[in-house]
């Protein structure tokens, strides 16, 4: 069982394993096999959880194609990319909020005074968490800046593109800023804060920022960098990489066991069951229900996506009210409290040359739809 999970063993494995009579996960398995066969992804590790159990797990293809082929493995560690945002940075912010360190609707500049520059003085913590801040999608990478301090200067100098609260624009700058907020208020670097206050309570021993070089063979590589070196255990996101591998928007590495445990612990806490998840139930409910301005139709929780054009991992059957997130490298996690289910897909779709583009969008949608159908979600 995965109830209250930290690092706990899988209850069931393999295609077709299910918690309800007649459930058939063969269509899920076929979708994943076909994606590998077409070259849409080099390899994939996937899991479907339901009722506290893993009811399907799939491992297909290769975790590496270059410099030499390596078979995919359930224990492969992946660059989680933007899944860092809702799984690490947002809960870190909310832990500090639970402690009374700040309110969600206070200006960010109250805690980070330099953030007030360039018209950002009224942007709130909630607006960063929901991507309604008005800030641009990312820092400018056209100039050759390097280092955390250089990134901080650029964040503080960033000028909004539009008024806060006007429109949903997904922005890495929002979560870089939130990572800086966590560090400033807690007095800890974000990676150390996450290890101590999020990963350790959940028993996520295979997760963290800047993995040790000795773990390289267990990590799925992404693509060649500008120096023609294959990135492996080094964050793929170029902004996070320039920042040294630790940032609020990207940098987490993890594997299927740890991410499945995270998902189940969150669902358990949300439902009021026993759980190691390091936030209160009311906080989890707040994070996973719409928190954007009331008159806006792009629905965002605090860190989590609910109903926007990014919500393809919901598929065609899981309801609005389910929630999740994606990562650029080819990762996604979607959770449905109504059916007590989650769908986890881990790939390094950018390997080896940054290709394998929009096919991942269709794969996420189709796998979620097939999984929901197998679970009897209509």
PLM region descriptions:
Residues 45-47, 127-129, 333-334, 342-345:
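Structural recognition of the beta-strand scaffold that forms the well-ordered cores
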